[in-house]
């Protein structure tokens, strides 16, 4: 698990955990209404890098700062910010976990300035997600992302041929930051 602070928003911390071998995605989805205020569960097939994830987190915090939030909480706003469109239900359908998801990203915003107890948070996350937590990093994310699916969702043309995952990540970060401008 990674706990981060975005320098421009020192009062908010963000926790990110990556899970594989998830066995209860359907159960998590059925409890989403009660969990949505606490966590966001994101399909890592559509996240090719930490840079992409942090770009959506930053966009979320900007939306909050300028009172442009379109969802009920920070976690759901971040899922929307990952999306190339402004359609909330479409964002959840595409970027949220599926009943058969075997990997997921667990995201939580912490709005108080207290220290985040990583062990307590890990205990809560592992009580919800029945799977193996692995380090949230680009190497592990690269094992799960689906370039064809990303191209379809973000409507990337066949002419766009990034040389590596960094080129793809840059394009997605640009799309996230420019949406709505």
UniProtKB/Swiss-Prot annotation:
Cellular component GO terms, alphabetical: chromosome, telomeric region; cytosol; EKC/KEOPS complex; nucleoplasm; nucleus
Pfam families in alphabetical order: CGI-121
Family according to the record: Belongs to the CGI121/TPRKB family.
What GO molecular function annotations does the UniProt record carry, in alphabetical order? Answer: tRNA binding
The gene name on file is CGI121
> What is annotated about its quaternary structure and interactions?
Component of the EKC/KEOPS complex composed of at least BUD32, CGI121, GON7, KAE1 and PCC1; the whole complex dimerizes.
The record's annotation in InterPro entries points to: CGI121/TPRKB, CGI121/TPRKB_sf
Q: What are the subcellular locations of this protein?
A: Nucleus; Chromosome, Telomere
Q: What is this protein called?
A: EKC/KEOPS complex subunit CGI121
Task: State the protein's purpose.
Answer: Component of the EKC/KEOPS complex that is required for the formation of a threonylcarbamoyl group on adenosine at position 37 (t(6)A37) in tRNAs that read codons beginning with adenine. The complex is probably involved in the transfer of the threonylcarbamoyl moiety of threonylcarbamoyl-AMP (TC-AMP) to the N6 group of A37. CGI121 acts as an allosteric effector that regulates the t(6)A activity of the complex. The EKC/KEOPS complex also promotes both telomere uncapping and telomere elongation. The complex is required for efficient recruitment of transcriptional coactivators.
Give the record's keywords alphabetically.
Activator, Chromosome, Nucleus, Telomere, Transcription, Transcription regulation, tRNA processing
Q: Set out the biological process GO terms recorded for this chain's protein.
A: DNA recombination; maintenance of translational fidelity; positive regulation of transcription by RNA polymerase II; telomere maintenance; telomere maintenance via recombination; tRNA threonylcarbamoyladenosine modification
TM segment ranges: none
């Amino acid at each position: 698990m990674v706990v981060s602070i975005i320098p421009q928003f020192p009062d908010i911390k963000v926790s990110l955990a990556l899970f594989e071998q998830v066995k209860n995605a359907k159960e998590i989805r059925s409890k989403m209404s009660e969990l949505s205020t606490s966590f966001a569960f994101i399909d890592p097939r559509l996240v090719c890098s930490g840079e992409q994830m942090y770009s959506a987190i930053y966009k979320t915090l900007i939306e909050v700062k300028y009172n442009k939030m379109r969802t009920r909480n920070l976690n759901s706003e971040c899922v929307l910010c990952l999306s190339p469109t402004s359609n909330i239900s479409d964002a959840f359908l595409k970027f949220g976990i599926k009943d058969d998801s075997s990997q997921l990203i667990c995201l939580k915003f912490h709005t108080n300035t207290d220290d985040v107890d990583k062990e307590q948070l890990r205990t809560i996350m592992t009580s919800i997600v029945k799977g193996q937590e692995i380090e949230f990093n680009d190497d592990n994310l690269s094992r799960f992302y689906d370039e064809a699916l990303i191209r379809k969702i973000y409507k990337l043309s066949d002419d766009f041929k990034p040389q590596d995952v960094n080129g793809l990540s840059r394009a997605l970060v640009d799309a996230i930051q420019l949406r709505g401008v």
